[in-house]
């Protein structure tokens, strides 16, 4: 009986985590460039069998017999598939047609700055001429420097990321990509940051001016999953 209660308990924890992720996806369905998150699940006894290992064999798990100890969250993942493009015709709205990220200088509450990466190209120019995100973070060029533009000039963004002011090239967007997206983690609402082991590479994408990339969230699919998860949670709750 105790094992049955524990199985239901771990099931509730698992479904609660899935529900949190789905809720966050739905909350960001209209967030520009947002990427869907998901979770995987695995049997708790499989994890335990891997952890309890015979020291004579560092790879093979020790045989511990039949168990039924419920389920646990495996790992979180991000779906980096592209969202659809929305026409805005705004000068500083940009979208990337393939894999790649805009480079942004983010400053936290402690005043520490670091480079983050985003697919959200809804930019603007300040009175001082700085190209910034909608949150006021500085957009960086291909050398990692802040981009300054003449607010009164006619600005055109080339497909390769080159920025033209009144027909003359003045800067180039810092568009970066990574060899393995498993080394990227979500940061805040719409940024990504590399973790140890991440390797940068040249981005092979085009820049489209006057467009924004929508999120890749399928609202109907997320709602169906939410109903399924809620029912599974209630079932485990009734067992307890």
Give the positions of each predicted feature.
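Amphipathic alpha-helical polymerization modules
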Residues: 1-240
